[in-house]
């Protein structure tokens, strides 16, 4: 099952991936940057190509989001997957994901004033231009190699969309567990074991 590592761009997702990679995929907790890709990115063109989706047809990619996630889940293991996508129906009809395709989510929040500075540098634009980008719905690349366009939304919409993915909804969904972290470092419970 998928555990989403979701965030608005430049909010620390790669840092959290590095922590999780050190804990779950590296020997003795020492980060090996080659293993950072143990946590993949969604949407990513390689996985869509693998399952026969025309990556040059945006509608085909969108229509296959949930199907691809269900195919990923056939691996029958817990997988962390990074995304900057907002959790909504794109164009009102293409869901990013659903409760059946996801075990849970970790949403990484960074003060948007700090995001502006970092994102402006990343985009090579002024902080004012970045602020304008962040308050509009937009799509962009995750910044990873071979990533498809991601429907990011505004900073507020991105944050609120993931905030609305409720613990109670998942808990009631077919008896599967949904794990919610209240405070960083204080877990209610965890399905993960260190390798």
What residues fall within each predicted segment?
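PAPS-dependent sulfotransferase catalytic domain
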Residues: 1-169
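Phosphate-binding beta-loop-alpha motif at adenosine-nucleotide cofactor sites
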Residues: 6, 165-195
């Amino acid at each position: 099952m998928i555990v989403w590592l979701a965030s608005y761009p430049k909010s620390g997702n790669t840092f959290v991936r590095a922590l999780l990679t050190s804990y779950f995929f590296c020997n003795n907790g020492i980060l090996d940057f080659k293993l950072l890709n143990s946590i993949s990115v969604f949407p990513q063109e390689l996985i869509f190509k693998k399952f026969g989706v025309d990556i040059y047809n945006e509608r085909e990619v969108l229509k296959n989001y949930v199907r691809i996630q269900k195919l990923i889940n056939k691996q029958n293991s817990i997988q962390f997957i990074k995304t900057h996508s907002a959790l909504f129906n794109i164009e009102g009809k293409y869901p990013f994901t659903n409760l059946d395709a996801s075990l849970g989510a970790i949403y990484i929040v960074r003060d948007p004033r700090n995001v502006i500075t970092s994102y402006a540098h990343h985009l090579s634009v002024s902080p004012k231009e970045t602020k304008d980008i962040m308050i509009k719905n937009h799509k962009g690349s995750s910044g990873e190699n071979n990533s498809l366009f991601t429907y990011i939304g505004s900073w507020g919409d991105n944050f609120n969309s993931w905030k609305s993915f409720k613990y109670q909804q998942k808990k009631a969904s077919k008896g599967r567990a949904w794990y919610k972290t209240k405070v960083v470092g204080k877990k209610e419970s965890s399905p993960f074991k260190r390798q």
